[in-house]
């Protein structure tokens, strides 16, 4: 291969999926000359698995990304076709927006956004080598011999890195959706000293809608009052499609069990570790033998296609078995399978090789993002891409890094989990991973994170000021509700008794009534004639603040206590071999992870409270 000097840039982003997009846009918007490389420009922003954005925990990530200045939420609001707020029957901490996307529209929106972005070039090429000088990134080389000098590189390869797809005994070197795998980069990364591992994920079959009997399924409409992902989306989104629910049955399970010896998962063909929270249908059947059925959601792939996605039927069984099991499912008895399910194995890095900035510890200027870091999911990838892009830009500008803490939200929690604890399987974000769920609601992400977005230059002063005014309006409304008293009346007490709560004997403020779990801000409007016209988000924030006041105060105290440990930093050059009294396991883990603070050190698996005490005493003595 003939090499040639193809030019230079500040930052090279390798991959144009959800991580690569956010990394490239963030870096370019911060003024850095950026090139984003994609194996195929027609796959920019592709959704090779479920055609949806958000979900439990994931919707929180999208809102937080929007509050920081990312793009996913805005693109989703332009491309999504059905919106549902999950967990409405539970507390506000776990309310999570999920929306079906028109996958091709989403790609179109994102590709055009990249192409129109100042300081950003998009190129179709496979990067096969990352070059270094004096331990730092110096250039990237493509499969055609083009060498681009650069000062930083961000790896956002998704499932393409040495990917292979598996359907029964048919194994192909391939990325998702039949696209080419990225074959050349893994040996280079190993030569740079990175610890690589092999993970696996999978996807279900797709079917033609014309061959489906929807009358045998349960309709799953969108919300009657849908809301979008982006805080900047002013007009309410529109539901333009519906989903359906059906189930597997004992005949489906019998076919799977009769052919389990042909499953690559159980025959040993698949070596990669799969996602715990998105198992294949054969894994579900083998693991939960007592369950007579499993849910399957039938989801549209977009408005311009008849293809449907069968969520819950991920598999790597042979194609003939897939057809048989598909035809046992109510409504799918005559379904025409347009694409068969497959598993895909790919290379990824041990995320404990990364700093919280997502820069690798072994190569200066080399960052990882998304599935390369061991996570799963579009949303998890997008937020990591953003963090990597921002930190690469800040480092090249000589500015302080952006390190999001667990107390800041779900993005900080995700990254801390990956770089501190590591993961032995594809990591998925869930609300249960956050210790501060009530503070980290999806509805207040703008309040929590817009200030950081302003500092890094990705949120405008105008938008920041609008957020401050929004929450000032919330405070004004809370004060008004505290001061507005309602006298006992026959009408009020009848309303209270109807809603299962005690009548008022000597009057009460509206705030006191809203604090009752049986009552709502909207419902009490009957007894609040002076109520001002307020936007829905302001009304909602006021109600949440009053209803959960005690819990919120308690969690804020926990954050305050947490900050003490996080603010006690450990020196970059600390030699843990010199710290006498540390247990061997703790010493090894601390040397590998190299935590930034006592807080991070305390969360490392294998480092006990006693080890932290030893470290604190040693640090005091060092002073």
Predicted segments, located by residue:
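An anion/pyrophosphate-binding glycine-rich loop and adjacent beta-alpha core
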Residues: 40, 186-323, 420-517
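Conserved beta-strand-loop-beta-strand element in the redox core of flavoprotein oxidoreductases
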Residues: 131-147
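A glycine-rich dinucleotide-binding beta-alpha-beta segment and adjacent secondary-structure elements
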Residues: 309-375, 403-416, 535-589, 594
């Amino acid at each position: 291969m003939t090499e040639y000097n193809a030019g230079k840039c500040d930052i090279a982003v390798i991959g144009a999926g959800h991580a690569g997009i956010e990394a490239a846009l963030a870096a370019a918007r911060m003024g850095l000359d950026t090139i984003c490389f994609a194996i195929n420009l027609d796959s920019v922003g592709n959704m090779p698995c479920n055609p949806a954005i958000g979900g439990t925990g994931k919707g929180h990530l999208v809102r937080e990304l929007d509050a920081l200045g990312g793009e996913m939420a805005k693109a989703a609001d332009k491309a999504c076709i059905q919106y549902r707020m999950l967990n409405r029957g539970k507390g506000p901490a776990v309310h999570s927006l999920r929306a079906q996307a028109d996958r091709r529209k989403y790609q179109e929106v994102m590709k055009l956004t990249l192409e129109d972005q100042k300081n950003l070039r998009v190129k179709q090429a496979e990067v096969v080598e990352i070059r270094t000088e004096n331990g730092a990134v110096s250039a990237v080389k493509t499969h055609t011999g083009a060498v681009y000098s650069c000062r930083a590189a961000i790896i956002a390869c998704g499932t393409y890195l040495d990917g292979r797809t598996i359907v029964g005994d048919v194994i192909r070197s391939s990325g998702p959706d039949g696209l080419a795998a990225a074959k050349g980069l893994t040996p280079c990364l190993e030569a740079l000293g990175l610890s690589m591992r092999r993970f696996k994920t999978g996807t279900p079959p797709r079917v033609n809608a014309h061959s489906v009997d929807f009358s045998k399924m349960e309709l799953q409409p969108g919300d009657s009052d849908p809301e979008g992902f982006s805080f900047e989306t002013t007009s309410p989104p529109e539901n333009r499609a519906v989903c359906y629910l059906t189930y597997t049955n004992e005949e489906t399970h019998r076919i799977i069990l009769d052919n389990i010896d042909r499953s690559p998962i159980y025959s040993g063909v698949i070596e990669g570790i799969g996602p715990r929270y998105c198992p294949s249908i054969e894994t579900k059947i083998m693991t939960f033998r007592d369950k007579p059925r499993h849910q399957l959601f039938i989801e549209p792939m977009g408005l311009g296609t008849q293809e449907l996605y069968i969520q819950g039927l991920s598999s790597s069984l042979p194609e003939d078995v897939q057809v048989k099991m598909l035809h046992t499912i109510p409504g799918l008895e005559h379904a025409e399978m347009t694409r068969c399910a497959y598993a895909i194995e790919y290379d990824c890095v041990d995320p404990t090789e990364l700093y919280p900035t997502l820069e690798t510890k072994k190569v200066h200027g080399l960052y990882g993002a998304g599935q390369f870091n061991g996570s799963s999911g579009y949303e998890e990838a997008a937020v990591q891409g953003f963090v990597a892009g921002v930190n690469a830009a800040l480092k090249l500008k000589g500015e302080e890094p952006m390190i999001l803490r667990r107390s800041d939200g779900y993005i900080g929690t995700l990254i801390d989990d990956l770089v501190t604890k590591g993961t032995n399987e594809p990591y998925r974000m869930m609300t249960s991973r956050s210790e501060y769920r009530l503070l980290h609601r999806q509805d207040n992400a703008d309040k929590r994170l817009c200030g950081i977005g302003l500092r890094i230059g990705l949120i405008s002063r105008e938008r920041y000021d609008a957020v401050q005014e929004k929450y000032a309006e919330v405070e004004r409304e809370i004060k008004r509700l505290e001061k507005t008293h309602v006298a006992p009346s026959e009408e009020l007490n009848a309303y209270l008794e109807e809603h299962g709560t005690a009548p008022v004997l000597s009057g009460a403020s509206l705030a006191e009534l809203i604090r009752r779990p049986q009552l709502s801000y909207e419902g009490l409007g009957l007894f609040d004639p002076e109520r001002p016209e307020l936007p829905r988000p302001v009304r909602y924030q006021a109600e949440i603040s009053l209803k959960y006041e005690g819990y919120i105060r308690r969690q804020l105290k926990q954050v305050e206590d947490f900050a003490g440990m996080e603010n006690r930093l450990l020196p970059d050059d600390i030699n843990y071999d010199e710290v006498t009294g540390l247990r061997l396991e703790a010493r090894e883990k601390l040397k590998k992870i190299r935590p930034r603070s006592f807080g991070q050190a305390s969360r490392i698996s294998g480092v006990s409270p006693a080890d932290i005490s030893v470290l604190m005493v040693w640090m005091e003595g060092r002073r």
